[in-house]
Curated annotation (Swiss-Prot):
GO terms of biological process kind: phosphorelay signal transduction system; regulation of DNA-templated transcription
DNA-binding region range list: 167-186
Short name of any one Pfam family annotated for the protein: Response_reg
Plastid among keywords: no
Sites bearing 4-aspartylphosphate, chain numbering: 54
Changes after translation: Phosphorylated by LemA.
InterPro entries, per database record: CheY-like_superfamily, Sig_transdc_resp-reg_C-effctor, Sig_transdc_resp-reg_receiver, Tscrpt_reg_LuxR_C, WalR-like
Molecular functions per Gene Ontology: DNA binding
Role description: Forms part of a two-component regulatory system GacA/GacA(LemA). May be involved in lesion formation, swarming and in the production of extracellular protease, syringomycin and N-acyl-L-homoserine lactone (acyl-HSL).
Record-annotated HTH luxR-type domain positions: 143-208
Protein name: Response regulator GacA
Amino acid sequence: MIKVLVVDDHDLVRTGITRMLADIDGLQVVGQADSGEESLKKARELKPDVVLMDVKMPGIGGLEATRKMLRSHPDIKVVAVTVCEEDPFPTRLLQAGAAGYMTKGAGLAEMVQAIRLVFAGQRYISPQIAQQLALKSFQPQVNNSPFDLLSEREIQIALMIVGCQKVQTISDKLCLSPKTVNTYRYRIFEKLSISSDVELALLAVRHGMVDASA
């Protein structure tokens, strides 16, 4: 039996995935989590084989949660399930150790296939994402997105700033001092050649880092 943990900040998505997988032989959804922080707690408690991880969530987000989870539980297989099809997200998640990357537009059959493949030690990447990554490997090495210049931590903090989270809130969630958060903030501004949170938000929307309709 493959034990699955479903991580998404939207209750309808978590419930929908759980119900879809309930009737699949050989799979058991052992729990749900609505944030990156909770996913780490549930991973310790429930010891899932496979984690279906959303990327954009409040708090530390799917990227940082994946990195921390695999550091503590290297045997867990993480599959990103997200609307984020454009780089840098696929590349960043796979570099962080995710075993799979698929879009929320995938059907039940594809999701089950992904779970079984990664459990067996293979990787699964949705065809459209795989094609995009393959084409990118043949392109000249240029920074298509200014966010490619940022480290994982800088992207994490940038997205939290765009999400209107205050410095103290970011500090508390990431266990960093407010001074350190501000240092990251100014470094992000410098790398992106911007000077305000508003410019950061506009740049994030323009390059697909956030959903403009959200």
